[in-house]
């Protein structure tokens, strides 16, 4: 396979993954978007976390909330727990990397808030501890996962929502997570900003 064929292959595999996900994920994406919309209507906030590419996804979601997606609107309260290098490194140094998100949630999370937890494997210890901390604070969890959901799946409660991409490849899962994040942003805009229905 030459490089041109490889690029074409990657496009085709990404399209196949998204196509396979459509019927499986529409319902949980809508449910998650409605849950997030109600959270914001009730003047609560959305915290997000992830590692590596998933950290970038967490920041992507937060930036769309604080700035805007495709509709002019006020800022919505959202915070990516991945962005404060001083806090993350202090917790990792003094305690452990597994606690870099859970300790922030203990200080920042409140009942009625939502945690957007993103993990392609479902096994990242800091994400697992973040979910436990969110439950202690009375928060619901929206989890973006892949593969078999990992240990993360076993921690979710009946009021939590898992959006699991049916793929094994980390790259394909992350590409679909980006689309899911845009779908969530679009739902929130349409639920909270009536004029966005026209676009």
Curated annotation (Swiss-Prot):
Zn(2+) binds at residues 60, 64, 174, 182. GO terms for molecular function: carbohydrate derivative binding; D-sedoheptulose 7-phosphate isomerase activity; zinc ion binding. GO terms for cellular component: cytoplasm. Pathway: Carbohydrate biosynthesis; D-glycero-D-manno-heptose 7-phosphate biosynthesis; D-glycero-alpha-D-manno-heptose 7-phosphate and D-glycero-beta-D-manno-heptose 7-phosphate from sedoheptulose 7-phosphate: step 1/1. Substrate binds at residues 51-53, 64, 93-94, 119-121, 124, 174. InterPro entries: GmhA/DiaA, Phosphoheptose_Isoase, SIS_dom, SIS_dom_sf, SIS_GmhA/DiaA_subfam. SUPFAM superfamilies: SIS domain (SSF53697). It is found in: Cytoplasm. It catalyses: 2 D-sedoheptulose 7-phosphate = D-glycero-alpha-D-manno-heptose 7-phosphate + D-glycero-beta-D-manno-heptose 7-phosphate. Binds 1 zinc ion per subunit. Its cofactor is Zn(2+). It is an enzyme of class 5 (isomerase). Homotetramer. The reaction produces a racemic mixture of D-glycero-alpha-D-manno-heptose 7-phosphate and D-glycero-beta-D-manno-heptose 7-phosphate. Catalyzes the isomerization of sedoheptulose 7-phosphate in D-glycero-D-manno-heptose 7-phosphate. PANTHER family: DNAA INITIATOR-ASSOCIATING PROTEIN DIAA, SEDOHEPTULOSE 7-PHOSPHATE ISOMERASE / DNAA INITIATOR-ASSOCIATING FACTOR FOR REPLICATION INITIATION. This is Phosphoheptose isomerase. It comes from Coxiella burnetii (strain RSA 331 / Henzerling II). The gene is gmhA.
């Amino acid at each position: 396979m030459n490089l041109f064929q490889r690029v074409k292959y990657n496009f085709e595999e990404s399209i196949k993954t998204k196509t396979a996900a459509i019927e499986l994920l529409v319902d949980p994406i809508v449910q998650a978007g409605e849950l997030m919309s109600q959270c914001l209507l009730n003047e609560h906030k959305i915290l997000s976390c992830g590692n590596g590419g998933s950290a970038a996804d967490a920041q992507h979601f937060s930036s769309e909330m604080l700035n805007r997606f495709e509709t002019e609107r006020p800022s919505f309260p959202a915070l990516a727990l991945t962005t404060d290098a001083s806090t993350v490194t202090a917790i990792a140094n003094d305690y452990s990397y597994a606690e870099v998100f859970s300790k922030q949630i203990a200080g920042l999370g409140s009942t009625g808030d939502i945690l957007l937890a993103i993990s392609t494997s479902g096994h990242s210890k800091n994400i697992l501890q973040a979910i436990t901390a969110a439950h202690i604070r009375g928060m619901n969890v929206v989890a973006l996962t892949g593969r078999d959901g990992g240990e993360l799946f076993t921690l979710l409660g009946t009021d939590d929502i898992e959006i699991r991409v049916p793929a094994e490849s980390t790259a394909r899962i992350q590409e679909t997570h980006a689309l899911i994040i845009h779908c969530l942003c679009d739902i929130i805009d349409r639920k909270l900003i009536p004029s966005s229905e026209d676009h």
